[in-house]
Regions:
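Outer-membrane beta-barrel channels and translocator barrels
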Residues: 7, 18-19, 55-57, 137-139, ...
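Solvent-exposed beta-hairpin/edge-strand motifs
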Residues: 142
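Surface-exposed loop/interface segments of Gram-negative outer-membrane beta-barrel transport/assembly proteins
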Residues: 1, 34-41, 45-129, 145-215
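Residues embedded in well-ordered regular secondary structure
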Residues: 1-37, 75-77, 114-121, 134-137
Length: 215
């Protein structure tokens, strides 16, 4: 019921910068085992940054992130560690055993692996977010930048409990399904003005016009 948990983490990235452009791309994957049997999850991430100077006055770019987290694993109930006799045997995979469901021979303490054997589960969370921007550099210290920042989050949850489990046979088993999705965005219009005089005095003003929506 308890493991020597191992965490694996892998990352790779590439980047380059030129006179009029630069980019960065990374990919990461993590596989995490919990100390309890079945208490595990995995995660995939990627990030992309791009920027290009289209001309002396115009710059465009984006910074985007995506992540996917899988929490489909089913952990056992470790409280059974303090309830079972050390002489119990784990017969969860032996349908002919009288102790397959209740290792103690009593129906008061169930095998912590038994319910998981008859359960199928998928639970995944995904996120996509970032910023797409354009910047305009104007004479006399003026500049304007527009940022579009979207965020999309969604998850999928599926669970099936089979009627082959004698504890669920009376109700014919059960199924559960859920989809959730959330999307929001915002647009920032940033106006900036910088002015320097007498070689030591600086004046700077910034104005922001914003719009946003969640759904």
């Amino acid at each position: 019921m308890l493991n020597n948990a191992v965490q694996q983490n892998y990352n790779v990235s590439i980047s380059k910068k030129g006179e009029d452009y630069q980019y960065y791309w990374s990919i990461g994957y993590m596989d995490n085992e919990g100390i309890k049997d079945g208490d595990a999850f995995s995660r995939f991430t990627t990030r992309l940054n791009l920027e290009s100077n289209v001309s002396k006055y115009i710059t465009v770019g984006l910074n985007m992130n995506f992540s996917s987290r899988d929490e489909s694993a089913i952990a056992v109930d470790t409280k059974a560690l303090t309830w079972f006799s050390p002489y119990c045997s784990n017969d969860v995979n032996n349908p002919e055993s009288a102790n397959q469901h209740y290792p103690n021979g009593s129906n008061t303490i169930a095998n912590p692996f038994y319910d998981r054997k008859y359960t199928d589960k998928k639970q995944v969370y995904m996120n996509l977010d970032g910023t797409i921007y354009g910047r305009l550099n104007l004479p006399f210290g003026f500049s304007y930048q527009m940022n579009f920042t979207p965020r999309l989050a969604w998850n999928e949850s599926f669970e099936h409990k089979s009627a082959k489990n004698d504890a669920w046979a009376g109700e014919g088993g059960s199924s559960f399904r859920q989809h959730n999705k959330a999307f929001n965005w915002q647009v920032d219009n940033v106006f900036n003005w910088k002015y320097e005089f007498l070689d030591k005095h600086k004046v700077e003003a910034t104005f922001l016009v914003n719009a946003e929506k969640s759904q």
